[in-house]
Swiss-Prot record:
Subunit-structure text: Part of the 50S ribosomal subunit. Forms a cluster with proteins L14 and L19.
Example GO BP: translation
Cited SUPFAM superfamilies: Translation proteins
GO CC annotation terms, alphabetical: cytosolic large ribosomal subunit
Family recorded in the similarity comment: Belongs to the universal ribosomal protein uL3 family.
Post-translational modification: Methylated by PrmB.
An annotated Gene Ontology molecular function: structural constituent of ribosome
Bridged cysteine pairs (disulfide): none
Purpose: One of the primary rRNA binding proteins, it binds directly near the 3'-end of the 23S rRNA, where it nucleates assembly of the 50S subunit.
Species of provenance: Magnetococcus marinus (strain ATCC BAA-1437 / JCM 17883 / MC-1)
InterPro entries: Ribosomal_uL3 (IPR000597), Ribosomal_uL3_bac/org-type (IPR019927), Ribosomal_uL3_CS (IPR019926), Transl_B-barrel_sf (IPR009000)
Protein name: Large ribosomal subunit protein uL3
Entry annotated with the keyword RNA-binding: yes
Keywords: Methylation, Ribonucleoprotein, Ribosomal protein, RNA-binding, rRNA-binding
Length: 214
């Protein structure tokens, strides 16, 4: 298992196969990501590498974080994430990782935060039918109806579908096929859609259920 990469969702486009078939793709700017630290099974109890993405002003970081980057001899980064790996010794602190590690026709898992919708009612959030439009209905047209029983159990059950904040949740889409790789600009195109809005942060790993391309 090798390290994934941190990136930004650039938006969606389309590509055409040799036989003229059109496929929707999502463009992702991956890296360059610098290896800031390594975690080993002997010292930390697990194997991983810590990657930094997008350079940041040192003044915007705490003294502790600046010291961490100075120790690794890496310019300060805005985003810091860890990826589990099989062999951390195959990575060097300060090494730059780019999109060229992914190959066309390989499969990846993409993790991102879904588009936030704000406070939403039960009809939009959960697809409830709502109340009656007429025939005695009074201000219950988009209501969720009853939320429980009476004195027994005397409470609302956990995970009851109700109105609330919709979206802005971490989700992973698995087994997306890599349709194109631009090693120079460190951009990949994956078939289909991925979570998040344009410009949102995403994590791209080798597909867990398809096996690594190593």
């Amino acid at each position: 298992m090798r390290s994934g990469l941190i990136g930004r969702k650039l938006g969606m486009s389309q590509m055409f196969t040799e036989d003229g078939q059109r496929i929707p793709v999502t463009l992702v700017q991956l890296g360059p990501c610098a290896v800031v630290a390594k975690r080993s099974d002997e010292q930390d109890g697990y194997n991983a590498v810590q990657l930094g993405f997008e350079e940041a002003k040192p003044s915007r970081l705490s003294k502790t974080v600046r010291g961490q980057y100075a120790k690794a001899n890496v310019t300060p980064r805005r985003v810091l994430r860890e990826f589990r790996v099989s062999n951390p010794e195959s990575y060097e602190v300060g090494q730059e990782l780019t999109a060229e590690q992914f190959a066309v026709d390989s499969f990846v898992d993409v993790t991102g935060k879904t588009v936030g919708k704000g406070f939403a009612g039960v009809m939009k959030r959960w697809g409830f039918r709502g109340g009656r439009a007429s025939h005695g209905a009074h201000k219950v047209h988009r209501s969720g109806g009853s939320i429980g029983q009476c004195q027994t159990p005397g409470r609302v059950y956990k995970n009851k579908k109700m109105a609330g904040h919709m979206g802005q949740q971490t989700r992973t889409v698995q087994n997306l096929k890599v349709a194109y790789v631009d090693a120079v600009q460190s951009i990949i195109a994956v078939k289909g859609s991925i979570p998040g809005s344009k410009g949102s942060l995403v994590l791209v790993r080798d597909a867990l259920k398809k096996g690594s391309a190593e």
